[in-house]
């Protein structure tokens, strides 16, 4: 090939050889330089040029990476036809109910309950939730079901093994008998009045004895709290807590025995100094405070329970009043 002159220079024209990688043609001298460079660029992936980053350089504009588009979740097939049919059935059932109410005939049966197929049913409580709520609820309901089952096992174990206190105590059965030696009657449990007891002023002794016996028989039907109130009237040695003024004791009301509740509330009046006494039909009876702790029993004569404190007046288990030795 002959050389050609261009712009005062000589350019050699020879045979052009193609590149094996990109397919372009080069002179043999240039192809030696192009070969390794083209091979390197082909094996190495070229980075995309971000023009916005280059424009933001030297300015206050922050360079934010572009957000990648999220793939849209697949759409579920809509159940609009089923929902439409359920809606029509509900309207027809409501119209039939209104017509039956107007005519006064028999009410039609309610339509069957409908469930949304898109909801997920909880295996523990059988309720239905959407996907987001079901993921949170099922774990919570699982823990709740485990706790309830554990509580049920614990309650059955405690029922199978009752406490010793419930095994020891048995409430006494109220039995009436004519024999004087039995201790089942309420009057025999209370201390009997001694011969040196105080007599009521202005009232015959026969009436006092009859009233005390009638009160002793009525103690069986009263609650433990009423027994504690009525017990001081049965014996002369028992000293109740509350008192009445001497003026009330000298002039007793005629309807004391007829109205028990009124008698109990009005006949007990506490003094500010702490000493108490009670009156029934004008008679004064001393309380437990006057006795020393040595004269009082430590255990209940009815159920055998020990009194928690020395000044206890009633049994904390059965409610029977504490006797005096």
Curated annotation (Swiss-Prot):
Cofactor needs: Zn(2+)
Residue numbers binding Zn(2+) 1: 19, 22, 34, 38
Residues with the Phosphoserine modification: 223, 292
Sequence ranges of Basic and acidic residues compositional bias: 48-58
GO MF term list: zinc ion binding
Annotated signal peptide: none
ZnF start-end (C2HC/C3H-type): 15-44, 118-147
Ranges of biased composition (kind: Low complexity): 177-188, 197-216
Start and end residues of each stretch annotated as Disordered: 43-83, 150-260
Modified residues (Phosphothreonine): 244
Positions bound to Zn(2+) 2: 122, 125, 137, 141
The keyword Hydrolase is assigned to this record: no
UniProt KW keywords: Metal-binding, Phosphoprotein, Repeat, Zinc, Zinc-finger
Gene3D superfamilies, per the entry: Classic Zinc Finger
Family annotation (Pfam families): zf-C2HC_2
UniProt record similarity statement: Belongs to the ZC2HC1 family.
Entry protein name: Zinc finger C2HC domain-containing protein 1A
Organism: Homo sapiens
Gene symbol of the encoding locus: ZC2HC1A
């Amino acid at each position: 090939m002959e050389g050609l002159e261009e712009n005062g220079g000589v350019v050699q024209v020879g045979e052009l050889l193609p590149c094996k990688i990109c397919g372009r043609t080069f002179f043999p001298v240039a192809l030696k330089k192009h070969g390794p460079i083209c091979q390197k660029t082909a094996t190495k992936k070229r980075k995309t040029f971000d023009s916005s980053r280059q424009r933001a350089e030297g300015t206050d504009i922050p360079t934010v990476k572009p957000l990648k588009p999220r793939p849209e979740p697949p759409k579920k097939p809509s159940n609009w036809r089923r929902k439409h049919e359920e809606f029509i059935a509900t309207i027809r059932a409501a119209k039939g109910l209104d017509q039956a109410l107007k005519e006064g005939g028999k009410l039609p049966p309610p339509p069957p309950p409908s469930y949304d197929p898109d909801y997920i049913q909880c295996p523990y409580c059988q309720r239905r939730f959407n996907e987001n709520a079901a993921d949170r609820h099922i774990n919570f309901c699982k823990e709740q079901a485990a706790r309830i089952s554990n509580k049920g096992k614990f309650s059955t174990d405690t029922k199978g093994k009752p406490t010793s206190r419930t095994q020891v105590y048995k409430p006494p059965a109220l039995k009436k008998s004519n024999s004087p030696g039995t201790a089942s009657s309420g009057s025999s449990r209370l201390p009997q009045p001694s011969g040196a007891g105080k007599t009521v002023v202005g009232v015959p002794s026969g009436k006092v004895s009859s009233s005390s016996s009638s009160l002793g028989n009525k103690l069986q039907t009263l609650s433990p709290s009423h027994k504690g109130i009525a017990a001081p009237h049965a014996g002369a040695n028992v000293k109740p807590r509350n008192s009445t003024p001497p003026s009330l004791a000298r002039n007793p009301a005629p309807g004391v025995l007829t109205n028990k509740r009124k008698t109990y509330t009005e006949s007990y009046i506490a003094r500010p100094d702490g000493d108490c006494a009670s009156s029934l039909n004008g008679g004064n009876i001393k309380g437990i405070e006057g006795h020393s702790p040595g004269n009082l029993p430590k255990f209940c004569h009815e159920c055998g329970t020990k009194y928690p404190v020395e000044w206890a007046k009633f049994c904390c288990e059965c409610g029977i009043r504490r006797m005096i030795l």
